[in-house]
Amino acid sequence: MTEQQKKFPEFYVTAPQPCPYLAGRLERKLFTHLTNDKPPELIDRLLTTGFRRSQNIAYVPYCEGCQACVSVRVLVDEFEPNRSMSRITARNRRLVARRIAPEPSSEQYRLFRTYIDARHSDGGMADMSVLDYRMMIEDSVIDTFLTEYREKPEGAVDLAIDQWPLKAVALCDRLTDGISMVYSFYDPAEANASLGTFMILDHIAFARRIGLPHLYLGYWIEGSRKMAYKAKFGPQERLGTDTWERVEPSSSSD
């Protein structure tokens, strides 16, 4: 690879395929490969200006005639949980978060498979093997970490934390100006615990503690029920044509 290719990466466009979020539409992605010889500041720039990471690929929607996918990030220093979010935090008070290196385990994979089979059995990740899961966790050229959420058993005085039941896992990247939530999953049997919301709340608090101003939540699509939850976390910024634009939390948040 030449020095010019390191500074100016090559981009590619995927073939059109059905959009998983908007019925009757086709999606394409613009993507580039992330490698160790690319400048860290270049990779960080991509991931803080609308690109998302999947293993060692950085991609952004590149759909003809459609700009529905909007990057969103929470302004963590100004964020205040609404009443519903406070109840969710209280409901999960027995969960303990542990930040660890991006090292997959068979226990994580079992939980991942349970989650996928229950919630996304017809999605693009339905056929992921244990090797695929390992690659999703390990393949990264930036500062990536896992957060495991384990439930402390009643009276577990001498039981090590890694023996507590695993309830949820989040895969995240640490960027120069925030944390990017790459993927998360949880025990579908705990549907009433709202673990997806709880993990976002926990990472907002974590970003604030370590002095990072943003939590990146990926793409939000107006009118998509799958994406509607992201509008509840605010104030947030949404990436426009040229800059990030401030948006207050949705009025239905409480």
Regions found by a protein language model. Name each.
Residues 60-61, 70-77, 213-254:
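Active-site/acyl-donor-binding loops of N-acyltransferases
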Residues 52-65, 72-192, 232:
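A conserved beta-strand-loop-helix scaffold within acyl/acetyltransferase catalytic domains
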Residues 112, 200-203, 230:
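Residue-level preference for non-acidic, small/hydrophobic
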Residues 1-85, 92:
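Intrinsically disordered, low-complexity, positively biased terminal segments
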Residues 207:
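Hydrophobic pocket-lining residues that define ligand/cofactor binding sites across diverse proteins
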Residues 192-204:
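Conserved acetyl-CoA-binding loop-helix of GNAT-fold acetyltransferases
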